[in-house]
Amino acid sequence: MEEEQQQQQQQQQAQKMQGTEQSAQLPPSAPGALPALVTGLQGTEANALQHKIKNSICKSIQSKVDCILQEVEKFTDLEKLFLYLKLPSGPSNVEKSDQNSLSSSRAQQTHAFSWIRNTLEEHPETSLPKQEVYDEYKSYCDNLGYHPLSAADFGKIMKNVFPNMKARRLGTRGKSKYCYSGLRKKAFVHMPSLPNLDFNTSGDGLDGIEVSTLLQSADEEVVSAACRLVCEWAQKVLSQPFDSVLDLARFLVKSHYIGTKSMAALTVMAGDSAGLKGITQTSAFVPMSESNSFHPQVRNLTSQVDAKQQLQRKIQKKQQEQKLQSPLPGELQVKKQDGTASNGITNICNGSPAILSPQPIGIVVAAVQSPIPVQRNRPLVTSPSPIGSSEGKVLPLNVQVVTQHMQSVKPKTPQNIPASPVGDRSARHRYPQILPKPASSNALTIRSPTTVVFTSSPIKTVVPTPHVSSLNVVKMTTISLAPSSAGTTVKQTSNNSTSATDETRTGPQIKNGSVVSLQSPVPRVGTPVASSVEVKTEPEIVSEDTAVRCQKSPDSSKVQKRTLMSFTHKGNQESVTSKLSHDATRDQAVKSIDHRAEGTRTKCKSRSVEGINVSSTGSNQSTLTLCVAPRTLFNNRSSQNTNGDQGVKDVRMCTKSPRKRLPTTGQESPIPPAKKSLLGQLPSECPAPEGIAIKKIPKTLSAKNDDAVTLALVPSKETEGNNTTLAANYSLSCVAEAPSDTPQELVASSQDVNLKLEGNVFKFVNESKSDNPFSQDAWQQIAEDADFPSSNCEQTQTIGVLDMSGTSGADNLQKPVWDTVDFEGIQQDTYSQQLEDSSLNQLQAHSSNQLPQRSDMTDPSFFSFDDDLTQDSIVEELVLMEEQMSMNNNPQNYGNLGMVLQNQSTASHGTPVPTHPGSAHFYHSVHSSVTPVHTPTPTPTPTPTLTPTPTSEMMCGTQSLSRESPCSRLAQTTPVDSALGSSRHTPVGTPHSNCSSSVPPSPVECRNPFAFTPISASISYDASIVSSSPVKPMQRPMATHPDKTKLEWMNNGYSSVVNPSISSHGILQSYKELDSFRKPHAFAVPGQSYQSQSRHHDNHFGRLTPVSPVQHQLSIINNASKQEGFAVPAPLDNKSTNSSGNSNFRCRSVSPAVHRQRNLSGNTNCPVSNVPQSNMTAFGTLVAPEIQSILNNIQPDSANSIAQRSQSVPLTVMMQTAFPSLQKQSNTQNITHVLLSKLDSDRDDAVRGLGINNLPSNYTARMNLTQILETSPMFSGASQQNILNSSSSSYEFQTPSYLTKNNSSEQISFTPGENQAQADDIGEQQLDFSSTVKDLLDGDSLQTNQQLVVQVASELNNASDFSSDIRLSSELSGSINDLNTLDPNLLFDPGRQPGQDEDATLEELNNDPLFQQICNESINSMTSSGFEWMESKDHPTVEMLG
């Protein structure tokens, strides 16, 4: 490019000069007329050449050249000559390289395109390494002096040339390369066509002759491509689809757009009468068959007679050929563009290539002749292709898709569907069958024949089914096809169609999630297509026998019974109107999904549950569970084009495979009357197991309170690949709230409920203002239900469900009762057993017993596990490992709790509910006695991690134990990658592996969330707490070995100190927000905040009054001792659950129960020996392992359980480590909140054992890390934060610099220079804490902390100082009481002046009564010096501090 540009400049200037030189020879007018004439060229050719060159140069350069020319015109001849001689020659300078690098010119693209076309060809058996291809292209460009395209641009051109090519990574581990699969170098290379440089031909003939010669030389591909372009353009201009240039020409002639008397027009018309009809009927895509090439040339063809005739001949020939052979796979795109299948049938397959490939389905597409003649070539289903005109006609689409039994078809097969053109009004129906290709792993296997009949237009479909098999959902949704492209309006013909789709695991969705149901392409915007479908499901004799039993065979995808839903047109009661607003169209095609089906789904959720009988009572209004959430065929569809309906499939319905994207559900579709309320509400006693591996606690979907069925629509935003379809996985859980009420009642009350999806928030609008507006309880339940960790949703999206009172209108939020539901595609389902017991559920519906049953949420479908993991196996592991682990429940519950916390981006954008849309909101259930403390963190750091740090944590007092704020439970495991920004779901265990992303989850863990990860997981990430599962015999906590422990303390203590310092020092929120802090964790920090909430049964914790985190933790510790006795491996080494875990201390003698502390992740409290909370003193904490554990607990957010393992550690050892003083955090939350939140996390334990002591849920591998990481948004950085900081809390205080030995080998010193002693270890830490802390301190003007840090660092550097001055006598290590009595000098460096560290910030804090109280109560609230005011407090710790 640069060269061309310069050459042009030179050329033009040179030509200028030459023109002047020629002036003598030429007539005086010549130079003026052709200033840029090149000698030897005729005027026309010179102009042509100049014009060509000019077009290849960007505008800016053209303007520059013009300016230069203006200057040059003023020169004398000599000056011009001089300029000409001075023009630089040779390769152009790099001056313009920057401009070129920014954007590739069309010339470069053309070169690349031609090189690719001439060098490579498709070959299914071979692959070419991408780098080699690019290198070859680059060398080609270098040889010719072209500027090569950037690798990214080149890749785009490759995709254009070979749309079917896929990228693959081939090679052995560590040596794999990315390859273009399906390509090879051409075996036979054609001589490249060279541009015609012969400009000496006579100018007169230039027009006609040149075009014809160009056409003759142009290769057929180019011609067909040009035809396609012309047709495409004509379609836009004329709003009429044209299959070929012939059609266009004929149309132009018939419509009198052009003269009909010309030779060309006559020829066209003669050809038309001669038998072109057959041609037109050839596939709609015929010209498109070669669609892959793009060439803008030949635009003028239509106007050229010769061109037209030639094209006619060629096209006719081609069309006839193509009649014989169905279009090649590559042609799909073309088809799409051209006209989409005339019947629209092919369109099923035809959306975009992406759509095509993903779901293989054996489909027989029968185009049923629609009663109304459809105009020929009118695509009934308009694919998103540009063709669709804006007309909003709805064509009746009568398509019967019959899936062949057990045929698995590769995704590409759809491409092979011959288009059945309806042709000119003679609807010729072909019944091409897509032949199944060999099943591939992708291939969808349809267990039982699925028949999807799509009928369009208000259709009342009745599917009487005497028995309900496993639900076969017939999705009766009218698909309004807006064949926008054709101007002709077609009457809507309603066809009744019923489809019983075998749902492989998810009813209608075929395993791949491609629902047989055709996705009606979203009508084009501007096409008002609203077809209402009234579907009545009349459970005909749905006998309980026929209870929908979703058997989930280990291969959940494989066995699914088929339930036929009988739909009767009952009145509007069930009618689902799916309206597609144009706007909505994109979001959702017909949304009317039988939400009732969803309701049943709620029941059905369990369906995937093994062997769970969802008995639909025989006569219940039996809206049997219509799982009418057909998956849209195109999982990939990037836009929510597909009918929301199809998308709506119950999340559970969704294929289990986490990979699949649930089709987006119509977000706006009102939920059809709740009639779908689970017909056979499961009797309360009837367990509707979550469908999750948790067999143990199937939750009964019994409706607990309200008649109203609550539909929880939980959209989970799943971004998979590029498609960010908000797959709203709505699991509409219709929970019949009145257990005894008949479903009808439920239906009646909920019928009018509209679920509106605004932004990410669903608003439930009770239109009917039914007698029972959904009670908040019901809503809470819904929220619980709604919280489906949809494994499919990779991106956890918080969806705030707003309960809008019907009367108040959608905008009225009845209450923030809704916990915003966080959907993390959490595999939690597997874990989550409904914690019926768990207080969380209670929390969720405190007053309302209502749904412990959110259980359904854990639907196998949500399992991120692939089918090979069976629920059974998972269940067994889970049950065996920790059936009681509340953890399982926690994740779900937190969802119930609306633990939106995790979601940073609350889906609540559109909804009034989220007060802080930016931050996940945690709404405590209104009923919970605990007052939720909603502290939005200033801003959840938007990190790739799915779980935004929940900014608000609910800190609950003792009640929190019972109700545990969801936060505690929330520690939901986030997808493993979340910290990395990948929301990809990993096997249930993995996402929650407690290891920070840096620590590879143990192989076991992947399968078993509770599995133990190797204790040796990386030490550097203390956050990576590997021991996620109960201790296994082989993994005795290293801490149990006294000598080893001591050594490790000595060796590692400092290394962990830095992180601990981070954790012990709350990382300032600004830091917390830093990616560096967050990223190390694979899991969102939200869990951490939970950790920080240690559950305190203690009364003082129960009160919301600020509780010193230390005391808090002490109580936690006490609780921990209470906690389940089964031994939990103490997080060894740096593995403490605290993500800052580097400072985790091993407790040698701590009982397993103590170790069980859940890695702090759950409790974040080291269950240290029970230490009287009051006894805990900051110094005591430093000194006593118990205290340290307390600190750890306090820091659970920071996940720096410094003391965690330290209980058994001798005081001397502990004393040797300096506890970095906590840095002041500008947390908005009160410490109390933080602590409470931590307590709540403890509550997970409660869930587990139903006792506060049950930390197991936290303890589970996933929980450990996830809680630590996820618990507190503050902690989200996985930065170790002060325990207090862990939850973002308003309180600020400096933690005393504790002398504790942290496992991490680093010293606590924050100053970058000062950790030198242990500086080497720092490298392991997630952050170089010294610099980070320093920045934090500076940034937050925490000079005091900084000073403290410096002092601490200096002290740490001089470890000897600590050992001599601060070391406690080993005698003291025995009990905290002793510690309380210790001489303060032992704990603190006597040399240090109490006032030294105090700073303006401290003074501010001192002025804050709450802060003071907190400081008083929390050991770590103050540095030894620094809070003199605390001396007035009666705590011995305070005294010691003083």
Swiss-Prot record:
<comment type="similarity">
    <text>Belongs to the RFX family.</text>
</comment>
<protein>
    <recommendedName>
        <fullName>DNA-binding protein RFX7</fullName>
    </recommendedName>
</protein>
<dbReference type="InterPro" id="IPR036388">
    <property type="entry name" value="WH-like_DNA-bd_sf"/>
</dbReference>
<comment type="function">
    <text>Transcription factor. Acts as a transcriptional activator by binding to promoter regions of target genes. Plays a role in natural killer (NK) cell maintenance and immunity. Plays a role in the process of ciliogenesis in the neural tube and neural tube closure by regulating the expression of RFX4.</text>
</comment>
<dbReference type="GO" id="GO:0000979">
    <property type="term" value="F:RNA polymerase II core promoter sequence-specific DNA binding"/>
</dbReference>
<feature type="DNA-binding region" description="RFX-type winged-helix">
    <location>
        <begin position="112"/>
        <end position="187"/>
    </location>
</feature>
<feature type="compositionally biased region" description="Pro residues">
    <location>
        <begin position="935"/>
        <end position="947"/>
    </location>
</feature>
<dbReference type="Pfam" id="PF18326">
    <property type="entry name" value="RFX5_N"/>
</dbReference>
<keyword id="KW-0238">DNA-binding</keyword>
<keyword id="KW-0539">Nucleus</keyword>
<feature type="region of interest" description="Disordered">
    <location>
        <begin position="406"/>
        <end position="426"/>
    </location>
</feature>
<feature type="region of interest" description="Disordered">
    <location>
        <begin position="929"/>
        <end position="1001"/>
    </location>
</feature>
<dbReference type="GO" id="GO:0000978">
    <property type="term" value="F:RNA polymerase II cis-regulatory region sequence-specific DNA binding"/>
</dbReference>
<dbReference type="InterPro" id="IPR036390">
    <property type="entry name" value="WH_DNA-bd_sf"/>
</dbReference>
<dbReference type="GO" id="GO:0000981">
    <property type="term" value="F:DNA-binding transcription factor activity, RNA polymerase II-specific"/>
</dbReference>
<dbReference type="InterPro" id="IPR003150">
    <property type="entry name" value="DNA-bd_RFX"/>
</dbReference>
<dbReference type="InterPro" id="IPR039779">
    <property type="entry name" value="RFX-like"/>
</dbReference>
<feature type="region of interest" description="Disordered">
    <location>
        <begin position="1"/>
        <end position="36"/>
    </location>
</feature>
<feature type="short sequence motif" description="PxLPxI/L motif">
    <location>
        <begin position="192"/>
        <end position="197"/>
    </location>
</feature>
<dbReference type="GO" id="GO:0006357">
    <property type="term" value="P:regulation of transcription by RNA polymerase II"/>
</dbReference>
<feature type="region of interest" description="Disordered">
    <location>
        <begin position="485"/>
        <end position="514"/>
    </location>
</feature>
<dbReference type="GO" id="GO:0045944">
    <property type="term" value="P:positive regulation of transcription by RNA polymerase II"/>
</dbReference>
<feature type="compositionally biased region" description="Polar residues">
    <location>
        <begin position="957"/>
        <end position="995"/>
    </location>
</feature>
<dbReference type="GO" id="GO:0005634">
    <property type="term" value="C:nucleus"/>
</dbReference>
<dbReference type="Pfam" id="PF02257">
    <property type="entry name" value="RFX_DNA_binding"/>
</dbReference>
